[in-house]
Amino acid sequence: MNLILLGAPGAGKGTQAEVISEHLHIPTVSTGNIIREALKNGTEMGHKAKEFIDSGRLVPDEVVIGIIRERLAQPDCQNGFILDGFPRTIPQAEALDRMGTAIDRVINIEVADEDITRRVSGRRVCPGCGNTYHLDYKRPQKEGVCDKCGDTLVQRRDDRPETVRERLQVYHEQTEPLKRYYAAAGKLVMVEGQDEVEDTTRLTLEALDGIEPLSPT
C-alpha cells in the first residue's frame, strides 16, 4: 500500500505518519529526513541540495525526485510506504507518476490557518537538551525555563508567527492544488485535523478502512 500524506506545515502530518507506519508496518519516507541523510552522507545530490538549503531556496525538483527515487528503490519500501513532504507541487506529482510509482490513497489533514499559527507559534524549545514545550498544551513548570535542564527556552525562527504565515502562503500557492489533482484521480481522502492528537489519529485510521496491515517483520 503506497500512501501520500498531505497537509499544511504544522497540520500534524509527521505524527500521523508515525501512527500509520506502526499500524500498517510500512516505512515513512519523509522528504526532510532523506534530504538530511543525503547531506550527511555527502552524496552528489546531497551537495546540490545543500546549496539551495543554505541560501533559503527550495531544493529543485530534479534533486528531490532523484533522492526520492533512490529511497523508494530500497527493500523496505517494496511492500508499501508513506510519503510525507512529497510531492509538494503539481510538477512533482506528475514526476512521481512518470516514475511508475502507483499511489493507492492520499490522505489530506485539513487544519485552519489560524489554528496552525496558534499551534506552531506556541512552541518553545530548550537549546540545551532539546525538550519541547507549548504555551497552551505543554507548559514548563516554571515559565520560560526547561523542566529537565533549567536552560532558558527559546522560540525557533521557523515558529515565529510571521514565518508561519509565509510558509502557509507558499503552501496555499504551491501544494494545496494537489488536493484537486488527487481528487480528480479518485484517491483523495479528507481528514479534519482536531485539537487533540488522539482524535485526529482516530479519523486518520478510519481513512485507512479496508487496508489490511502487513505482517510485522
Model-derived regions: residue spans:
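Glycine-rich phosphate-binding loop of ATP-dependent small-molecule kinases
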Residues: 1-217
